[in-house]
Amino acid sequence: MAGHPNTDNVERAARLDTTALSDALDRLGIAGQCLGIKPLDPNFRLAGRAFTILYGPSASPSGTVGDYIDDVEPGGIVVLDNGGRADATVWGDILTWVAHERRVGGTVIDGACRDTHLARQLSYPVYSRSYSMRTGKDRVQVEALGGTVNIGDARCGAGDILRGDADGVIVIPRAHENAVLDAAEEIDKIEDEIRRAVQDGISLRDARARHGYHSLQTRKK
């Protein structure tokens, strides 16, 4: 399928479920599934480009957990790599409130957040590996902004597209976004055709066979 140079790819991603995007990534041999990263609320949705932050252990003298939120553009997705740590949170109520006020698109954390009630109250999308009450101050600090980070089993660079829904989060690498979105749109279309075929009286087995359902995600050679 051809690319869509006149269509914003974030909007294209927002129209797709993470399941179709995951199958497209499998087909292309790209590891973009952020396994283990879940929404605080299954109704949360996000789609936007990544603003990446890497955390490390607190040094002496201690650095800070970061004031980067002032630099995140509206619609951007804050992506925090804290190495999956559950013992030191890197996102809380002040950041949630400021991000919501500034129309940031959401937050994705390989690690823990806290003050989860406010994210739910404001319907501000937060996806994380865990949550806790324990602060990250004096335990972790920002090491780098704008680099490539790890989120679950995926690598995420600044400007990559993230798409989140009730099933989790997908990273769409910037270098491959047209190919991934084209494949996901094709998969989504075929699944709709299967549903219509069943509505018309065809058996699910025959509808799936007709449209190659069982190999939609198979890597192309």
Regions found by a protein language model. Name each.
Residues 162:
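C-terminal binding/interaction regions
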Residues 165:
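Beta-strand-loop-alpha-helix segment that lines the small-molecule cofactor/substrate pocket
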Residues 1-158, 172-221:
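Feature captures the catalytic cores and cofactor-binding loops of soluble hydro-lyases/lyases
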Residues 168-170:
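Channel- or pocket-lining gating/hinge segments that regulate access to a cavity or pore
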